[in-house]
Amino acid sequence: MYKSVSETRHPLQSEEQEVGIDPLFSYSNKTRGDLSQNGRGSNSTLDTEGTFNSYMKEWEELFVNNNYLATVRQKGINGQLRSSRFRSICWKLFLCVLPQDKSQWISKIKELRAWYSSIKEIHITNPRKAAGQQDLMINNPLSQDEGSLWNKFFQDKELRSMIEQDVKRTFPEMQFFQQENVRKILTDVLFCYARENEQLLYKQGMHELLAPIIFTLHCDHQAFLHASESAQPSEEMKTLLNPEYLEHDAYAMFSQLMETAEPWFSTFEHDGQKGKETLMAPIPFARPQDLGPTVAIVTKVNQIQDHLLKKHDIELYMHLNRLEIAPQIYGLRWVRLLFGREFPLQDLLVVWDALFADSLNLSLVDYVFTAMLLYIRDALISSNYQTCLGLLMHYPIIGDIHSLILKALFLRDPKRNPRPATYQFHPNLDYYKARGADLMNKSRTNARGAPLNIHKVSNSLINFGRKLISPASAPGSMGGPVPGNNSSSSFSAAIPTRTSTEAPRHHLLQQQQQQQHQQQQQQQPQQQQQQHQQQQQQQRLMKSESMPVQLNKGQSSKTISSSPSIESLPGGREFTGSPPPSATKKDSFFSNIARSRSHSKTMGRKESEEELEAQISFLQGQLNDLDAMCKYCAKVMDMHLVNIQDVVLQENLEKEDQILVSLAGLKQIKDILKGSLRFNQSQLEAGENEQITIADDHYCSSGQDQGSQVPRAAKQASSEMPGCTGGTTPDDFILVSKEDEGHRARGAFSGQAQPLLTLRSTSGKSRAPACSPLLFSDPLMGPASASASSSNPSSSPDDDSSKESGFTIVSPLDI
């Protein structure tokens, strides 16, 4: 028997010191201690009561109101179920395991649990127990009859062994999934589902969909047991959160989830193109994934990349297509496992909260897929094939997983969801490049060949060809035609048959011709073998190199010939001295070395060009972002400036002129952001100017000579014009651009920025437009444009006749 707490006290221990309580004592036996122990027990009771109160408060906030389901869904989308102790119940509501009517919860959950018990009893059987009730001719271990329990038992054993093999690899970093009872639950649920769905059976990856469900149920059960230690929970809680039915509830939730995910695991092919005409007229330049029958998951990931990604980021879409990274490489795992391997388990549960809360058909998966690509888009665009593959197959850790959900919601419906904060990702690209290289090396092991082996094979083929040709050229003293191939038949036929009396005179010529024929017959197979060798090498390079940049550049190399051309020489003529066979061997040997060196140089050049292209793509992406930002800022500024100008003109203000002048300056900034005005870089170098001023020749795109003539012409015109005071400064007048000539006819302030009707000086006086000293000289129109501009002083650079819209790149020589 266990001794009391007072009897187990150490003799040297003081009475005021706290004493540990034996955990095997019941709550009633704990009250038998001394006063200090009673005080400690009361404190623990208060703590447990506080825990139960917070537990009940969370239950009431989630489920005790009329519109509770909408509240729970919103919390799931907003990521507020991360620390919830009722996440499993929320998932049951999202997956329609529990009805919306709370009065039917208990009856529905009991029905589902009884359903799983019957399924388990049917499919998980022991043939030894039913041996006495069956015919032994059919029911025996050696029977192959379909109705034999032993035959079914061995088939089930094979299926269970395949499931157990995957279950052992489920979340190996977590101790929870290494427990035998948890593994048994995983195996039984997956086995029962496979037997209930014979058309699908079990597919690899299903265990990673079931594991988070079991983990969530286990956490909620532990929280329930902890909260029920201090108080008595309701019968509804006891029924829904009973730990004895963890396996039953997991099967019900997993079955509902697979109602949507079943097509993603199905291997049945569906051919969208049927009919005889499709076979006769195939699609030209179609990708391999677009031809022939495909499974549903392949169609889904192709649509995500070809439509969603192309819509939201055309640059990233083109980059992945240029690298030939098909979405099946990484997308199959992303979608099938609901991103189970891309995030840590706690972050994964938050993602599943949003996916389940959004809709039962999991339509948010497509946009989470796209948001994940956009999160690492800068790293992908600036990387080559290996690094991109490493990033996609080993997705980096995200600091705030909820920002990814907000991005996905914004991509789907930007009107209802605000734009999330811009997040930057700066990974260690060397790490992902190494991971991508490992993946590529595994796939290239059988495809890559050594260059030395290629040369050895080609040389052996050449020597073998020479042995076959050498017997044909042996009879050199005969006067008949020398047998040869088709290319030399015309040449041999041109030699007439000589008599024995003419033999001494033509003996030397015949020997020379026979040597030439032999050399020609030896060199022609050598050229053919070298060309065949280069073609094989290019094919191996095309198989081994996955980047299309390398393919396009590798095919432009020219064929190198190691021997002089003989096909162009006419038959019957005396040839110049051809190289002997030994020289030909040396030339072929050194040409092979030269080809290997040129190949290494070509590969080095390709790598440098790839890096340059990656940098150009990255810079082009930044330029596109800046361009979009400037246009957006110009659009918003235009809208607000029009509103401010309308209000100012309607009110009689004391300093109205100064406000209008400031508005004109802001319109100049708007035009610079929009690209209507050229921005001179020298304005920043001249000093810290408080105001952006535009010179008279600001809109001239010609050289410095023409630009220097415009201010002088402006000064002369201003001095000759009557009624204009000579004490004005360039700051007295602000040139306001107008958007379009047709805006005057539509009336003032019709939704876009309009020019001011008068040019106002800083002194507050209004001046007539004829007194403006600002003249516009078009260098393309000649001097006449200077005088013509005086009649239309309000012309602005926004007119299409004088400039082009958008940004222009100004070289330092033009400034």
Swiss-Prot record:
Pfam families: RabGAP-TBC. This is TBC1 domain family member 5. The record marks 204 as: Glutamine finger. Residues 806-811 are annotated as: Required for interaction with ATG8 family proteins. The modification Asymmetric dimethylarginine is found at residue 448. Disulfide bonds: none annotated. The modification Omega-N-methylarginine is found at residue 448. The arginine and glutamine fingers are critical for the GTPase-activating mechanism, they pull out Rab's 'switch 2' glutamine and insert in Rab's active site. The LIR (LC3-interacting region) motif mediates the interaction with ATG8 family proteins. LIR 1 is also implicated in interaction with retromer; LIR 2 is only implicated in interaction with ATG8 family proteins. One of its GO terms (cellular component) is retromer complex. A motif (LIR 1) lies at residues 57-62. A motif (LIR 2) lies at residues 805-809. The keyword Transport applies. The keyword Protein transport applies. It is found in: Endosome membrane; Cytoplasmic vesicle, Autophagosome. The modification Phosphoserine is found at residues 44, 460, 546, 563, 565, 568, 578, 608, 811.
